[in-house]
Amino acid sequence: MKKLWQNCHIATMQNGQYSYIEDAAIVTEGHLIHWIGKQQQLPADTYSETVDLNGAWVTPGFIDCHTHSVFGGNRSVEFEKRLQGVSYAEIAASGGGIASTVRATREASEEQLLNSALKRIRCMQQDGVTTIEIKSGYGLNYENERKMLRVIRQIGEKLPMTVKSTCLAAHALPPEYKDQSDAYIEHICTEMLPKLHAEGLVDAVDAFCEHLAFSPAQVERVFKTAQSLNLPVKLHAEQLSSLGGSSLAARYHALSADHLEYMTEDDVKAMAASGTVAVLLPGAFYLLRETQYPPIESLIKHGVRIALSSDLNPGTSPALSLRLMLNMGSTLFRLTPEQALAGVTIHAAQALGLEQTHGSLEQGKVADFVAWDIEHPSEIVYWLGGDLPKRVVQHGQEVIF
């Protein structure tokens, strides 16, 4: 059955640009876009329902392509410590940081993790997010990584959203492997990843390449295992120092490399050549009060596609609004509103390998879109906070909050 959505203007975000269609209409059939264009060119047809969008601006549904939305506890006390001058690295070295979340996550049941995550993700959904990536990485052993990945799959069943799962077992060194990082990486590669993949719980594999996490050589071992399992890879790279992680990611044709504050021009060129998306995470940059900016001009100059994401996590980016990240991306990183919106639509889709089906409004793509009561799409980036009036459509069906 075909449904007509009419009386609107559309920012399709094709090719990373607004690509406006004014005085437009959309026809959906099932979960797909059947037709899109000028309302005066609408083909004669019979529709099961006609929806008047009252002159709204329609954008693709937002895609949050880098989150750690499933976790136990929170780290508000560490937030206070950082404001007293304690660094992220110092907190991690004293057993805080990721380690404290690992303890809380291991202690939590699947049901507890699911219920707490749903509260957070519903906030994102009400902000216009229709697709979300969620990483494991707070279990750090087979049993608890599996628990997290099972919860991620359940979120996809519970909510009207597209949910992609990423195994981030190589996030930090668990306490039982203290001073045995090579042995832990071997355990990930020979035991955890093959089993978790065999259970159908993994869509992609990620790792944290940093002095306080894993070396490029160790990450490469994980990447080779992922490659052998036909799983795409992603990487946390160059957040706190320059280790060449983004070039390593490019070598393995990673979907994305994320953070990237300390990447070099050679890293940028490598990512441009491989088509790897640069995912910028302004929430973590802001909360950690960083001063080293990602090389935005170089990324743009070399044609690297830039995505933005919330990096929702309990330690460095407890961000429940992707729209706020849009404003931060523009204010902190000097992205234009158009570039920022591309970063949570088509470029974010590319960072998840979903660009053929998601991220822009085109015939044949999934009917995920948001109708905003605004005068121009730049307003979505411009306004700070609040709940902009909107209608969210997921797979051709309006989501009722």
Swiss-Prot record:
Enzyme nomenclature, EC number: 3.5.2.7
InterPro entries hit by this protein: Amidohydro-rel, HutI, Metal-dep_hydrolase_composite, Metal_Hydrolase
Full protein name: Imidazolonepropionase
Keyword Chaperone (UniProt): no
Catalysis performed (reactions): 4-imidazolone-5-propanoate + H2O = N-formimidoyl-L-glutamate
Pathway: Amino-acid degradation; L-histidine degradation into L-glutamate; N-formimidoyl-L-glutamate from L-histidine: step 3/3
Family annotation (Pfam families): Amidohydro_1
Residues the entry annotates as binding Fe(3+): H66, H68, H236, D311
Protein's job: Catalyzes the hydrolytic cleavage of the carbon-nitrogen bond in imidazolone-5-propanoate to yield N-formimidoyl-L-glutamate. It is the third step in the universal histidine degradation pathway.
GO cellular component: cytoplasm
One example GO MF annotation: imidazolonepropionase activity
GO biological process terms on file: L-histidine catabolic process to glutamate and formamide; L-histidine catabolic process to glutamate and formate
Chain's gene name: hutI
Residues binding N-formimidoyl-L-glutamate, per UniProt: Y138, N313, G315
Family: Belongs to the metallo-dependent hydrolases superfamily. HutI family.
Chief place where the protein resides: cytoplasm
Keyword Ribosomal protein belongs to the record: no
Cofactor remark from the record: Binds 1 zinc or iron ion per subunit.
PANTHER family: IMIDAZOLONEPROPIONASE, IMIDAZOLONEPROPIONASE-RELATED
Intracellular or extracellular location(s): Cytoplasm
Record keywords, A-Z: Cytoplasm, Histidine metabolism, Hydrolase, Iron, Metal-binding, Zinc
Cofactors demanded by this protein: Zn(2+); Fe(3+)
Coiled-coil segments on the chain, per record: none
